[in-house]
């Protein structure tokens, strides 16, 4: 049994779970940590796709009561149908752009320097969103929960989500901060971001799994075990992170994450420029 491989799987699983739903970019962290662990070959890329599904399952489990209620009452409840419609509307822009330009973005921007730059730019947007929210006397008073969102609100969040196609931007950051910039309360923007992850990330993961099925990567027995371990680590850490973030946003803002992003971005730029870390991308 390769214990080093299993340790790498746990580390990457925890990184995926902790960063997928925080405004700090899971993709950016996985690229950088994957470089450091020398875990960025074809098997490593397949591994990242599969463990991402574990993080999505954590969201489904946390909000299982809401999802069951929407599913069971879809035919009879206008609120349930509007909720599903909002998710559909918010999913289309990023999924469409990803389908059209995803390969080009991966070819050009999936490397440490663009990722670090996106981290720093994202910091400035977080500061802007938090300052703007503080200056709003009445932050969309008609919106108290995700059930109050209108299709137009969903479209605005969906357009903001397009920025997440740039690695290092953060899908959750784009949707949460974008929602706040468009006037949504912080807690509502965060919860809607969780739900939006299910069709968007779930769909993207399913697409990547389909590509793996058509062009399979050979896995050894040990690597298959590493995938299982990473999947479980991603599920558990994502579940803990989602539950914590729900409570956090009720009383705090995202400024600490902004400082983290700028510090992390500067660190990456410095180590890349000086050669202290031999980034492989």
UniProtKB/Swiss-Prot annotation:
Question: By what name is this protein known?
Answer: Undecaprenyl-diphosphatase
The gene coding this protein: uppP
UniProt-listed PANTHER family: UNDECAPRENYL-DIPHOSPHATASE
* Location of the protein in the cell: Cell inner membrane
Q: Gene Ontology cellular component? A: plasma membrane
According to its record, how does it sit in the membrane?
A: Multi-pass membrane protein
Q: What else is known?
A: Bacitracin is thought to be involved in the inhibition of peptidoglycan synthesis by sequestering undecaprenyl diphosphate, thereby reducing the pool of lipid carrier available.
List, alphabetically, the InterPro entries matched: UppP
Q: How would you classify this enzyme at the top EC level?
A: hydrolase
By sequence similarity, the record places it as follows: Belongs to the UppP family.
Q: Which organism is it from?
A: Polynucleobacter necessarius subsp. necessarius (strain STIR1)
């Amino acid at each position: 049994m390769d214990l080093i491989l299993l340790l790498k799987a746990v580390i990457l699983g925890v990184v995926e779970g902790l960063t997928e739903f925080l405004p700090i970019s899971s993709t950016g962290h996985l690229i950088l940590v994957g470089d450091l662990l020398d875990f960025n070959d074809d098997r490593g890329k397949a591994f990242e796709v599969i463990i991402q599904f574990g993080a999505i399952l954590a969201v489904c489990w946390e909000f299982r009561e809401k999802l069951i209620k929407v599913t069971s009452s879809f035919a009879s409840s206008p609120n349930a149908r509007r909720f599903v419609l909002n998710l559909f509307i918010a999913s289309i822009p990023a999924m469409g752009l990803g389908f059209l330009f995803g390969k080009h973005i991966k070819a050009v921007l999936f490397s440490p320097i663009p990722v670090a730059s996106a981290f720093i730019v994202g910091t400035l947007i977080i500061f802007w969103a938090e300052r703007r929210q503080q200056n709003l006397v009445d932050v969309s008073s008609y919106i108290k929960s995700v059930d109050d969102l209108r299709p137009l609100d969903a479209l605005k969040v969906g357009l903001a989500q397009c920025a997440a196609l740039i690695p290092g931007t953060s899908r959750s950051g784009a949707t949460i901060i974008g929602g706040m910039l468009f006037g949504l309360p912080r807690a509502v923007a965060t919860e809607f971001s969780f739900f939006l992850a299910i069709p968007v990330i779930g769909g993207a993961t399913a697409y990547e799994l389909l590509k793996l099925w058509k062009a399979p990567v050979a896995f050894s027995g040990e690597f298959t075990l590493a995938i299982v371990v990473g999947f479980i680590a991603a599920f558990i850490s994502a579940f803990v992170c989602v539950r914590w973030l729900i409570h956090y946003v009720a009383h705090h803002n995202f400024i600490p994450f902004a400082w983290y992003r700028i510090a992390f971005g500067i660190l990456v730029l410095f180590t890349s420029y000086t050669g202290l870390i031999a980034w492989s991308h």
